[in-house]
Amino acid sequence: MEFDLISLLWGLPAAFALGWLASRFDLRQMRLENRRAPKAYFRGLNHLLNEQHDQAIDAFIEAVQNDPDTSELHFALGNLFRRRGDYDRAVRVHEHLLARADLSAHESARARHALAQDFLKAGLLDRAEAALLRLEGTPLQTDARLARLAIYERTRDWEQAAAMAELLEDAGRGSFQLRLAHYRCEQAATLRQQQHTTEALVLLEQLVQRIPESARAWVQLADLRHSLQQTEGAWAALQGMVQHVPGHLPLVAHNLALWGKRLGRTQAVRALLQQWSEQHAASLDVTQALVSLEDDAQAARALYLEHLRREPSLVAASLWLGGAHWGSPAEQKLVKPALERACEPLKRYRCAGCGFEARQYFWHCPGCQSWDSYPPLRIEEI
């Protein structure tokens, strides 16, 4: 008994010393690892600032290995993989985050939203939508609905897009009325292609009553009525557009003049176009519509001169020269095609968002997928 007591007394200090040494070793190891993690993290940030994405990824991978429980490092690494186009690795990082049992509800929602973004970028729209649907009822619900709206636009699911736009507007994320009008116009265009003209007509007539600020709805309604030999109704639709969305009149100036003449309302159309010209910047489309109403060639050419007094225009100058007799026929044959080629790019429309140029007017930019990003002006007039 005495021997056991003496052994115990000697053993306690030894055990304490060994424990202290072990703790010091673990503490030093922990400090070393914690020192490595911030260094790797800041090194990754430095590479990011220098736009060295590959080196930044390597640094963040090292930081994650040294500190695997830090969710922010995982988010940074996953987002880097996505920006680099390495979607498989981005998905794995965010799925690994979601599998962690210690993740808070907020971080779990963030990880699921990031995962949905990975799927979106990879073109896996079904999986992206499934991930976004699971964010209903979370703080990221509105962001998820915006992403779902983008999916429905890409898949041309206009009914779902319309429903989502109304939910977003109800949530106070701004006005989606014009966007909603575009969705309904797309549906009307589809109905017309399928020969369901009556349904398309009803849809557009209801639309201009609900959202009269939609220039596209008025234009499509006028075009559909005209195709049904309803010239009076088509003319009325164009007048409605001019009343509610006057800035878009240049898009329909030609049809206003053409249909107005057919209905015997040349003077009314001329007065309307002249009044618009006095209140807005010079528009070549409006000038050409006024020219089409003139029977006298000299009076028509005078309209181009009036346009040039208000706004220098190579296109207007070319059209004015086109009606004049100058030089020999051989000289005219040489000069006129050159002028026309020089004017051609100036007649195009240009997206204000991405700069995509097109000969026709687009309501939805084929380049950046923005709605209403084309001003109703030619490039020369911008």
Model segments located where?
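Alpha-helical segment of the N-proximal tetratricopeptide repeat
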Residues: 33-69, 76, 82-86, 92, ...
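Long, contiguous interaction/recruitment modules in multidomain scaffold/adaptor proteins
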Residues: 1-35, 130-133, 137, 142-146, ...
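Short coil turns that delineate tetratricopeptide repeat
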Residues: 68, 102, 106, 139-140, ...
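TPR alpha-solenoid repeat register
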Residues: 73, 107, 111, 144-145, ...
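Residue at a conserved register position within TPR or TPR-like alpha-solenoid repeats
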Residues: 47, 81, 119, 152, ...
